[in-house]
Amino acid sequence: MQDLGLARLIHAHAPDFALHASTQMTIHTLDAAKQARDIGFSRVVLSRECSREEIKLITEQAGVETEVFVHGALCMCYSGQCYLSAVIGQRSGNRGLCAQPCRLPYSGGYPLSLKDLMLAGHVAELSDWGVSSLKIEGRMKRPEYAAIVTKVYSDLLREHRRPTAEERDILRRVFSRDGFTDGYYTGKLGDSMFGTKTDVPMNEVKKLYDEAAHRFAEGKEAPLVPVSLCFTARKDTGAVLSADGVSVVMPVEQAQNRPTTPEMIEKSLRKTGGTPFYIENMRIEVQDGLMIPASVMNGMRRDALDLLLAKRGVAPSRDWLHGSVLPRDDETAAREGFRGYTATVRTKAQADALRELGLETVYVPLEVAAQTGLPAILPRVFSDNEQPQIEMLLGEAMSRGTDTVLAGNIGHIPLAKRLGFTVHGDFGLNAYNSKTLSALAEMGVSRQTLSFEARLAQIRDMRGPLETDLIVYGRLPLMIFENCAIRRQHGGKCSCQNGVTYLTDRRRERFPLLNEFGCRNTLLNSRPLCLREDFARLGVQTARLQFTIESPEECVRIARAFLSGAPLDGEFTNGLYKRGVE
């Protein structure tokens, strides 16, 4: 799951209920994985962008199970931070309904379409490190696709080996986009990771699908449950067959002629046909000179497996703490009324221009905070390798007077708290409801920017123990990605300092591309959001003006219009506040 509020609710009332943190939580650092563990998650699904070294580090040191994507579609954007489908088509990727607009053509071809992921050659080492689960992306794929790909990876995992040429070809034929990539895993980013769907001759695909369907129809693909057996036989205690927590006991006799051997016992016990079980491990200890008829051993096996079957049919019990399922104590905290406006900027010049307008808070990029001492925006994405640089900049910012950071990932919160900063939560934490506000407050957040995927009616209903901020102006950030699309738009040359780069879609809408920390990119909406409402009625304490490509003079003009209530000229959008998402 992604929703922190729902996770908090479940963990509070059913603490032994297993919670898995979705890839939509954008967990890609050790701090983020540990924070998820501390919230109550037992497993984290890591971002697809994690490198080999990052996966190994988190798996070995986070103290929580890890799940890793090994095959299937690769999103250009970090999962959980993509709002493109929601903003342009009302189908939210954060709710599992992405319409995949990144696969469409833009200026320069298909600059947002990556090849499918394939880590078939790395399964053995993932297993060796202790990765708990391998994840195969199968959304919007046929059942036969899921069966074929899963069989290949299951064989590789069970046999602890690399794929054969034939297996690689099977994966290619069943679906690919100009081949596959392991670029994030191996750290080889760039043009080789991009591709569009490859058309494979239909007869080749049909043959694979037919074979998969035939295996299923014959029952060859029926899922079997592994069982460990322990059989002991002694004259004084009899024969005891134990199978994963159940036991069957029968008397034994002294052999008159031919005693029963361990080989004879194993032959009888391995006959599991017609059951959902297969024998994974077996240990046999039998005293010499005993006779156990085959009919007795067969009966013991049947009885033990019947007991196991009955045991599997009983739903596991979970401790559910008494009390209301939906406690409302965290939704009744009194909050101040609307106080005024905040702003985020990208440059020192923008911040300087806004300094005298009396805004509640002006947040600046961390690099600018290190020069000015203003509240700092942490990069939404940075790796464990980059964290020392982040900590150095935070130290410089604190020495100049910065005491507050804007955090867009759960991993930022413990880092900022360790260093003594007040933490304000950014939109990247995807706060949709009152329960999430309460969860974030418990984590140490004192002000939270609400999700811009929420409707105004939902925002009015939100209550919680912390202040809330609402983005009301600016080009909304639609994607953030690890691969540099700016470089690709300029023929492979680094062009981040040469003004704003745009992607143009089929409708001739122009989407600005901006460089981010670590040579990452953010894709902005083609039109700025402009919401003019009675913010006091919405229940928020502050409203944010999010400045990106505006000049300092434009920042001042727009801020003054909001402060005075004057009209603004231009082409704007209300975003999703009135339309909502599916």
What are these regions (language model features)?
Residues L9:
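Phosphate-binding/switch loop-helix module in NTP-utilizing enzymes
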Residues M1-G5, H13, F17-H20, K34-F427, ...:
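Surface-exposed amphipathic alpha-helical tracts and adjacent flexible/coil segments at the periphery
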